[in-house]
């Protein structure tokens, strides 16, 4: 069991910023197309964080051309170049699934001070 924990700690990334559900983040994700590799930024609101250790994931939601798009990223993935926290949101829930039903101004999140 100790061997597994030591291997997992070796793989954990320590360069990631602290963020919570409700925060607006920009995730720079490496996309591999054939033999080319490029970095694709994805900006949106974190609606959920789950898990711990290497299996931790987070889901980012954004509205693109009027359609809500959600993408789940593994937190410690080597394909994540970096994560920028754009603004901190003030919410009282850990899972923000209610944002799926809201549109326009109702879907805004107050900024945390």
Swiss-Prot record:
The keyword Ribonucleoprotein applies. Keywords: Ribonucleoprotein, Ribosomal protein. GO terms for cellular component: cytosolic large ribosomal subunit. One of its GO terms (biological process) is translation. Pfam families: Ribosomal_L19. This protein is located at the 30S-50S ribosomal subunit interface and may play a role in the structure and function of the aminoacyl-tRNA binding site. This is Large ribosomal subunit protein bL19. It comes from Carboxydothermus hydrogenoformans (strain ATCC BAA-161 / DSM 6008 / Z-2901).
């Amino acid at each position: 069991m100790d061997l597994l924990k030591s291997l997992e700690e070796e793989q954990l990334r320590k360069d990631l910023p602290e963020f919570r559900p409700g925060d607006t983040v920009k995730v720079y994700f490496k996309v591999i197309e054939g033999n080319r590799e490029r970095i694709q930024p994805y900006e949106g609101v974190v609606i959920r964080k789950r898990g711990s250790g290497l299996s931790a994931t987070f889901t980012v939601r954004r509205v693109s051309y009027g359609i809500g798009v959600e993408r789940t990223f593994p937190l410690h993935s080597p394909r994540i170049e970096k994560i920028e926290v754009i603004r901190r949101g003030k919410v009282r829930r850990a899972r923000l699934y209610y944002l799926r039903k809201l549109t326009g101004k109702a879907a805004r999140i107050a900024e945390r001070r």
